[in-house]
């Protein structure tokens, strides 16, 4: 069903109702201003010239130089054949955080269409060979590449797997169910531990929405799986049975470490955009582990580790999800979700058992819902977006507690990353031309709370987010 579209809507109300709305808005504004006075403000730490090499959310942070400091890699993309189905990296640029280009593959473009793509580019930063320096693992021109993080030189390369003729007609998520190329054009990439090694050394690549391929660190294919249900954007690797090997949640299907299907959720439509593992800390399921998933028009889903649905909230096209300690006075980790209708969405907030507490609409697109360790006292804030008035961070009650300064910073993208100093997060905003990095306006602190969060080496625009006291899987 396609929702009705309107060119213009005029909403009227009585004078008394309008006065009540204005009073509520003023009360909310006063409550936000009072809260903001109690927390550190954003202080501009660095302004970086990206020299025309910027992008959308195709940004990765890591330790390319092995000196304990962060560097970053940005990928620009080229779209091919059909919309976002076969995007490929056209320019890959490594920077230090002073804005110096360390190396570059390809040529940058001023076409801003490079940043508006509904897919990940295949790219992660990770020390996959254990030499103490992060490599850049990527794919381009139907090859998987392991690049030296310091120089960009190729350390290993291998052709991507063939898309076999036998699979044509059964491939989901591509026009006419026929793949456009002889070899797979990777749509995303994840570091996994299917072999149960001392550290993750396996690489997962996937096509748009149907097939996943597990590679070892020599770029040899160990197994592949063709899904009967949409794979979603970023499958989640996790050891759910304690055997030391990662299993893989591919959309609604759970695979074992050899790529065999273990179970499937009783959902067939649309696809999972983001997945976050959780553990109930209270209520009837206390101690049980679960997956919190946003699944497009299927809404917000919570399943146990056997695929049984425990909760399903039909909130519309559910798009993003995060779990963190947003309300320290309540048990467990609260959940926040946003939906997406091609523009602004509604933010939904749930307690740790998946019961909805409140909802709000800030009329802006691209709400991240990233947990931010801003104060270092164990409470997480929710990063929305980089808008000065309606962005910034809110707390678990929906109160705007930290605002962005009105300093001309880029507003296309934002992220929370612990880049400097103590264990508290910095806030990064960027577009195609510049990057701003903010930190707290107070002094670095000792003995700051350091949560367990998603590792840098598995970055994605579709990964969901979590911030826990400890790793429990």
How would you describe each model-predicted region?
Residues 2-473:
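Beta-propeller-forming repeat regions
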């Amino acid at each position: 069903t396609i929702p009705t579209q309107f060119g213009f809507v005029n909403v009227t109300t009585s004078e008394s109702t309008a006065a009540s709305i204005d009073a509520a808005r003023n009360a909310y504004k006063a409550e936000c201003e009072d809260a903001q006075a109690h927390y550190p403000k954003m202080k501009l730490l660095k302004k970086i010239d990206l020299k025309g090499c910027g992008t959308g959310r195709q940004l990765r942070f890591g330790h390319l130089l092995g000196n304990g400091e962060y560097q970053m890699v940005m990928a620009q993309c080229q779209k091919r054949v059909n919309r976002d189905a076969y995007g490929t990296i056209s320019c890959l640029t490594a920077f230090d955080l002073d804005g110096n280009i360390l190396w570059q593959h390809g040529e940058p473009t001023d076409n801003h269409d490079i940043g508006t793509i509904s897919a990940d580019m295949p790219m992660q930063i990770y020390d996959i060979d254990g030499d103490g320096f992060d490599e850049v693992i990527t794919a381009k021109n139907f090859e998987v590449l392991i690049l030296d993080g310091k120089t960009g030189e190729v350390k290993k390369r291998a052709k991507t797997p063939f898309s076999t003729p036998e699979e044509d007609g059964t491939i989901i998520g591509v026009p006419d169910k026929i793949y456009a190329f002889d070899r797979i054009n990777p749509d995303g990439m994840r570091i996994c531990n299917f072999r149960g090694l001392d550290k993750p050394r396996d690489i997962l690549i996937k096509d748009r929405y149907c097939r996943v391929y597990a590679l070892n660190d020599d770029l040899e294919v160990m197994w592949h799986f063709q899904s009967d249900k949409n794979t979603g954007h970023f499958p989640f690797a996790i050891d759910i049975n304690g055997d030391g090997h990662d299993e893989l949640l591919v959309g609604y299907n759970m695979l074992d470490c050899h790529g065999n299907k273990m179970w499937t959720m009783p959902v067939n439509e649309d696809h999972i955009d983001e997945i976050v593992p959780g553990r109930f800390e209270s209520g009837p399921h206390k101690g049980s582990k679960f997956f919190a998933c946003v699944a497009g028009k299927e809404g917000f889903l919570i399943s146990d580790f056997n695929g049984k649905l425990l909760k399903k909230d039909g909130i519309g096209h559910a798009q993003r999800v995060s779990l963190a300690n947003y309300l320290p006075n309540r048990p467990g980790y609260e959940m926040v979700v946003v939906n997406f209708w091609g523009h602004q969405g509604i933010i939904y907030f749930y307690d740790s058992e998946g019961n909805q507490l409140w909802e709000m609409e800030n009329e802006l697109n691209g709400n991240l819902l990233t947990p931010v360790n801003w104060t270092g006292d164990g409470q997480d804030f929710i990063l929305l977006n980089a808008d000065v008035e309606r962005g910034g961070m809110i707390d678990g009650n929906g109160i705007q507690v930290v605002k962005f300064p009105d300093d001309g910073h880029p507003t296309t993208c934002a992220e929370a990353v612990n880049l400097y100093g103590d264990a508290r997060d910095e806030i990064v905003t960027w577009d195609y031309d510049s990057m701003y990095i903010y930190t707290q306006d107070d002094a670095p602190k000792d003995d700051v709370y350091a949560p367990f969060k998603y590792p840098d080496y598995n970055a994605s625009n579709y990964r969901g987010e979590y911030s826990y006291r400890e790793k429990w899987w």
